[in-house]
From Swiss-Prot:
InterPro entries for this protein: Ala_racemase (IPR000821), Ala_racemase/Decarboxylase_C (IPR009006), Ala_racemase_C (IPR011079), Ala_racemase_N (IPR001608), Ala_racemase_pyridoxalP-BS (IPR020622), PLP-binding_barrel (IPR029066)
The protein's name in its UniProt record: Alanine racemase
Biological or metabolic pathway of the protein: Amino-acid biosynthesis; D-alanine biosynthesis; D-alanine from L-alanine: step 1/1
UniProt keyword annotations, A-Z: Isomerase, Pyridoxal phosphate
Name of the coding gene: alr
Length: 384
């Protein structure tokens, strides 16, 4: 296990991730596969640790954003099928084939170049991305779709393993655009001479709300980590999700301020009475952003406001009473009856819950818990 020497850390509850995947496994129609989405270091939770847990809980495949993320999982011993959801270079097809990594394809000219560069015999699997209304990646034209299918068919090492699309509004209460995209996908599937083995369109929101329209695989991302795809549909979810990510620190200094004394850069906070101020070693360089000034944390089971501007490596909080150095501070998570959720942080920042754990950076070690015990400690600082 890695060591760390700053009293700020993330705790990842792998039991929660296991339960979220296992609950989805039970909820989905029989025969529906789960592709666990572990891009962006598993949304800040730890890619290999989450991948292994998800596979154990019933996922059969993994998805990442780009090839480097897939290769990193292979180096960490993850052997399950992996799909790269984003764009890849045609020059890297051989590398993907060598490591049994499936690539997303959506352009015939890309595929022509890849076929001219790849002279190997090892099969390379592709998933065709269709743009049904997201406007990001994906083929939209029938003739282009048929060209891609024909190119794959003419190049024997190439295998069309799957076809998919992505919903733009499955996390909204209004389902009009979702229904439009779904109908569009059904229509576009008929452009192919035959359907490949895997057909997938459902993200977390669609998998949990419209499991009858999931084809034979779903991509389970945000809700694997215990987070609702949006606050609006949280009451509509079929079962309770278990949040896996919590963030903690400790008081490293406690001081008493007199009325009129100031705190932090810009002297934007002024003590109104005698106040106890605590310093904790986390700042915007760790992803605890300056906009979280005036937010609160938990200390001694009570809420304590963040006062003054958040610094690069530290921030200050107003304590309810004098507390000893070393007292635990919870920035995300539970203390006693009080809870600060990722959704609470996202609401204060005016963003979505996805962004919060992704933003907590590499300087903050991750402690992984499984079966209520520490399984691993991972500190990325100093790792080459």
């Amino acid at each position: 296990m890695d060591e760390f020497h700053r009293d700020t850390w993330v705790e990842i509850d792998l039991d929660a991730i296991y339960d979220n995947v296992a609950n989805l496994r039970r909820f989905l129609p029989e025969g529906t596969q789960i592709m666990a989405v572990v891009k962006a270091n598993a949304y800040g939770h730890g890619d290999a640790q989450v991948a292994a847990t998800a596979l154990e809980a019933g996922a059969s495949r993994l998805a990442v954003a780009f090839l480097d993320e897939a290769l990193a999982l292979r180096k960490k011993g993850i052997d399950a099928p992996i799909l790269v959801l984003g764009a890849s270079r045609p020059e890297d097809v051989a590398l993907a084939a060598e490591h049994r990594i499936a690539l997303t394809v959506f352009r015939s000219d890309w595929l022509e170049k890849a076929s001219s560069l790849y002279n190997g015999s090892t099969p390379i699997h592709f998933h065709l991305k269709m743009d049904t209304g997201m406007g990001r990646l994906g083929v939209k034209d029938e003739e282009e779709t048929k060209r891609i299918a024909a190119l794959i068919d003419r190049h024997p090492p190439f295998v069309l393993e799957g076809v998919y699309t992505h919903f733009a509004t499955a996390d909204e209460v209004n389902t009009d655009y979702f229904s439009y995209q779904y109908a569009r996908f059904l229509h576009m599937l008929d452009w192919l001479p035959s359907r490949p083995p895997l057909v997938h369109c459902a993200n977390s929101a669609a998998a949990l709300r419209f499991s009858d329209r999931a084809f034979n695989m779903v991509r389970f991302g945000i809700s694997m980590y215990g987070l609702a795809p949006s606050p609006d549909i949280k009451p509509l979810l079929p079962y309770e999700l278990k949040e896996a990510f919590s963030l903690h620190s400790r008081l490293v200094h406690v001081k008493k301020l007199q009325p009129g004394e100031k705190v932090s850069y810009g002297a934007t906070y002024t003590a109104q009475t005698e106040e106890w101020i605590g310093t904790i070693p986390i700042g915007y360089a760790d992803g605890w952003l300056r906009r979280l000034q005036h937010f609160h944390v938990l200390v001694g089971g009570q809420r304590a406001p963040i006062v003054g501007r958040i610094c690069m490596d530290q921030c200050m909080i107003r304590l309810p009473e004098p507390l000893p150095v070393g007292t635990k501070v919870t920035l995300i998570g539970r203390q006693g009856d009080e809870v600060i959720s990722i959704d609470d942080v996202a609401r204060h920042l005016g963003t979505i819950n996805y962004e919060v754990p992704c933003t907590i950076g590499y300087r903050v070690p991750r402690i992984f818990f499984r079966n209520k015990r520490i399984m691993e400690v991972r500190n990325a600082v100093g790792r080459g």
